[in-house]
Swiss-Prot record:
Residues 1-21 are annotated as: Disordered. It comes from the Eukaryota. The keyword Electron transport does not apply. The gene is PYRB. Feedback inhibited by UMP. It is found in: Plastid, Chloroplast. One of its GO terms (cellular component) is chloroplast. Belongs to the aspartate/ornithine carbamoyltransferase superfamily. ATCase family. GO terms for molecular function: amino acid binding; aspartate carbamoyltransferase activity. The keyword Transferase applies. PANTHER family: ASPARTATE CARBAMOYLTRANSFERASE (PTHR45753:SF6), ORNITHINE CARBAMOYLTRANSFERASE, MITOCHONDRIAL (PTHR45753). This is Aspartate carbamoyltransferase, chloroplastic. Residues 11-21 have a biased composition (Pro residues).
Length: 363
C-alpha cells in the first residue's frame, strides 16, 4: 500500500501595504461623487467624472502645480546625474508599482521615456505597441473595455490614441490614474510640460518670452498643448507661422485671447525668428491628410529652419522641436548651440519621472 503523500502548508501571502493618499493636481473635477456639469450632456458627464490625478490636458495645471512638477523634475535630473550606469544610487520609490502603456499610434520618445522613467524609479512596465493592430482593438473591443481590463493588471495607464478625446474617456472609465500621451490631433500634455520646463532651463525665465510656433499648427497636438500651458505665464507673445492649409485653429486663438495672451499670424519666418526667444518648429503631419496628399505636398517644405534662420535668430534664443524631424530643420543646424531639441527630448525623462512619482506616491 502506497504511503500517504505529505502535504506542505502554503506560505502566507502578506497583506499589501496601503497606498499613500495622492496629492491631487488642480482643476479637474473629482472622479467619484462629482456634480454633473450640464444636464443631458454626454461630454459634460465625461468631464464631471474625471478624477484628480489624471493627466489629460494642459489647461488642468495652474502655476503652483507647474512649479511643483518642475521642482520634482530637477530632483529627478539630479538623481539621474548622481547615479551610476549600473543603477547604483537610483531611487526605488516606485518598486512594486506597475505601469501599463497602451499606444494605438507609433511613438519613440514618449513611450520609451515613460518606460525608462518607470524603471529608473524601480517600477515595472507592461507595454503594448501598435495596440490598434496587435491588441483586442483589432477584434473590435472598445477602448472602455480595454481600459477596464488593463487597470486590473496595473497601477497607472499611459495612453496614446488616434482619436481626440480618447484620454478623457479612459480617465472617466478607470479607477487608477490615466496619463494622456497624445490623443489624435487633440492634446499632448506631458510634451507641453517638458517643453515649458525646457524653455525655463534654456532661457532662464517663462514670463515675458516671445514664442514662434511653426509648421503644422492645425494637426499638431504638441503646439496646442504648449499654447494652453504657456498661457499660464505673464506677458507672453506668440507668433503663428504656417502654410494656409494647416493654420492654428480658432479654439486656441480664442483661448489665448481670453487669457490676455497676445498672438499674431505671420507668413515671414525670418522676421518672426529675429524677434523670438524660442522657435518651436514642427513637421507637417502626413498621416492627418488622408487621401489629400496634394495638400500635404503643398504644405511640406514651406517653412524650414536653416542657416538663414540662424543668422537672424538672437544669440540667446533656442530652436525646439517635439521630434521626429523630417526636413523642416536642416542637419547643419544641429551643431549650433541654440539647437535645443535633443536636450529638450532628454528633459522628457525627468518630467515623466516626476509625474509618475507625484501621481503614485506623492512628493
Amino acid at each position: 500500500m502506497a504511503a500517504a503523500r505529505a502535504t506542505l502548508p502554503l506560505p502566507r501571502v502578506p497583506a499589501p501595504s496601503p497606498r499613500p493618499q495622492l496629492r491631487p493636481f488642480p482643476s479637474l473635477p473629482a472622479r467619484r461623487g462629482a456634480v454633473a456639469c450640464g444636464a443631458g450632456s454626454a461630454a459634460a458627464g465625461v468631464a464631471a467624472s474625471l478624477r484628480l490625478g489624471d493627466v489629460i490636458e494642459a489647461q488642468q495645471f495652474d502655476r503652483d502645480a507647474l512649479t511643483e512638477i518642475f521642482e520634482v523634475a530637477r530632483e529627478m535630473e539630479a538623481l539621474e546625474r548622481g547615479s551610476s550606469s549600473r543603477g547604483a544610487g537610483r531611487s526605488r520609490v516606485l518598486e512594486g508599482y506597475l505601469m501599463a502603456t497602451l499606444f494605438y499610434e507609433p511613438s519613440t520618445r514618449t513611450r520609451l521615456s515613460f518606460e525608462a522613467a518607470m524603471r529608473r524609479l524601480g517600477g515595472e512596465v507592461l507595454t503594448t505597441e501598435n495596440a490598434r493592430e496587435f491588441s483586442s482593438a483589432a477584434k473590435g473591443e472598445t477602448l472602455e473595455d480595454t481600459i477596464r481590463t488593463v487597470e486590473g493588471y496595473s497601477d497607472i495607464i499611459v495612453l496614446r490614441h488616434f482619436e481626440s478625446g480618447a484620454a478623457r474617456r479612459a480617465a472617466a472609465t478607470a479607477d487608477i490614474p490615466v496619463i494622456n500621451a497624445g490623443d489624435g490631433p487633440g492634446q499632448h500634455p506631458t510634451q507641453a510640460l517638458l517643453d515649458v520646463y525646457s524653455i525655463e532651463r534654456e532661457i532662464g525665465t517663462l514670463d515675458g518670452i516671445k514664442l514662434g510656433l511653426v509648421g503644422d499648427l492645425a494637426n499638431g497636438r504638441t503646439v496646442r498643448s504648449l499654447a494652453y500651458l504657456i498661457a499660464k505665464y505673464q506677458n507672453i507673445k506668440i507668433y503663428f507661422v504656417s502654410p494656409d492649409v494647416v493654420k492654428m485653429k480658432d479654439d486656441i486663438k480664442e483661448y489665448l485671447t481670453s487669457q490676455g495672451v497676445e498672438w499674431e499670424e505671420s507668413s515671414d519666418l525670418l522676421e518672426v525668428a529675429s524677434k523670438c526667444d524660442v522657435i518651436y518648429q514642427t513637421r507637417i503631419q502626413k498621416e492627418r491628410f488622408g487621401e489629400r496628399i496634394d495638400l500635404y505636398e503643398a504644405a511640406r517644405g514651406k517653412y524650414i529652419v536653416d542657416k538663414k534662420v540662424l543668422d537672424v535668430l538672437p544669440k540667446h534664443a533656442v530652436i525646439m522641436h517635439p521630434l521626429p524631424r523630417l526636413d523642416e530643420i536642416t542637419i547643419d543646424v544641429d551643431s549650433d548651440p541654440r539647437a535645443a531639441y535633443f536636450r529638450q527630448a532628454k528633459n522628457g525623462l525627468y518630467i515623466r519621472m516626476a509625474l509618475l512619482k507625484l501621481l503614485l506616491v506623492g512628493r
